[in-house]
Amino acid sequence: MTDILSPLAYLCGKPTAKAKLKALPEHFQVNEVLGYSLTGHGEHLMVRIRKTGENTSFVANELAKACGVPSRAVSWAGLKDRHAVTEQWLSVHLPNGETPDFSAFLAQYPSIEILEVTRHDKKLRPGDLQGNEFVVTLSEVSDVAAVLSRLETVAELGVPNYFGSQRFGRHGNNLSEARRWGRDNVRSRNQNQRSLYLSAARSWIFNQIVSKRIEQGCFARFIEGDIALAEQQMFNVDGDLALWDQRLQAGEVAISAALAGDNALPTSGQALPLEQAELDAEPDLMALIRGNRMRHDRRAIALKAQNLSWQVQEDQITLRFSLDAGSFATSLVRELIEEIPVVRHYDQGHEQESRDSESED
């Protein structure tokens, strides 16, 4: 099956090396980092789990059963990939202060471990996630030297901050449904479904804008009318572009692209027609976005991994790095290798569909 992101431009050209990603769950390890400390008291039981080959929503549902509460009483800061070993916090609303016996739950699911239990005065929400720490192993690498050369470039320049294929659902189904909803003016009270489709719509258009900037040679430099980001503030780029580029190289500002909304683009000059063309190319997605009154936002077009390092052992390369919340490790890997398809065999004892892949953001 063709990757939904395959038409998008590569910063350094399509990789020549091939390798397997997530050949084993332990080849993709994720450690969640919250943006604050837990209080140790409050109405919410905080459970830090390590899961192998399971997705977040499945574990949350089973944890809710173990605690004797409805699924809506369990929340998280971010979804984690199924095909991985991941650590994250789940919060369970248990206002009476009780701590359930998890022994039966753990015996039923040896793929799930409980690492820590404490309490907090607020439930977990998606905005609570500061970022993730990754340990990613590329196996059966066809050309180790080529990957190492690219790693040097990635460490210096970063990679396109694409939303990963996980954002668009299995086989791109979320994106297909987003287009259908926009085309047919579908109205639904299913907030979760609507959120998934809106997210897919905005993410797709953002990716197209970033790809176009690479094609036009303005990924790593400002153009007239850009919007710069700096510490959650936005600035109109005008005046001497060379000075803006100096600030970009110094890491003081970032080039941004549109997360489309129902209001007008804030860009001008050269940047406005570049972005507007990609919005106009997706009338069904824009109909969905406008119909739901989404407000325009911005996202940096470049992704730079923090604390990036790597080790080589024969035909395996192990990467260690951290990413801020909302960024995709698979977007970094995409610049390094062409993935060799991996056939996975999972226990079919309970529903695979409900346990399929999720994003690392």
UniProtKB/Swiss-Prot annotation:
Its EC number is 5.4.99.27. Keywords: Isomerase, tRNA processing. GO terms for biological process: pseudouridine synthesis; tRNA pseudouridine synthesis. This is tRNA pseudouridine synthase D. Responsible for synthesis of pseudouridine from uracil-13 in transfer RNAs. Belongs to the pseudouridine synthase TruD family. It is an enzyme of class 5 (isomerase). The gene is truD. It comes from the Bacteria. GO terms for cellular component: cytosol. It comes from Vibrio cholerae serotype O1 (strain ATCC 39315 / El Tor Inaba N16961). It catalyses: uridine(13) in tRNA = pseudouridine(13) in tRNA. InterPro entries: PsdUridine_synth_cat_dom_sf, PsdUridine_synth_TruD, PsdUridine_synth_TruD_CS, PsdUridine_synth_TruD_insert, TruD_catalytic, TruD_insert_sf, TruD_pseudoU_synthase. Residues 158-303 form the TRUD domain. The keyword Repeat does not apply. The keyword Signal does not apply. The active site is at residue 81. One of its GO terms (molecular function) is pseudouridine synthase activity. Pfam families: TruD.
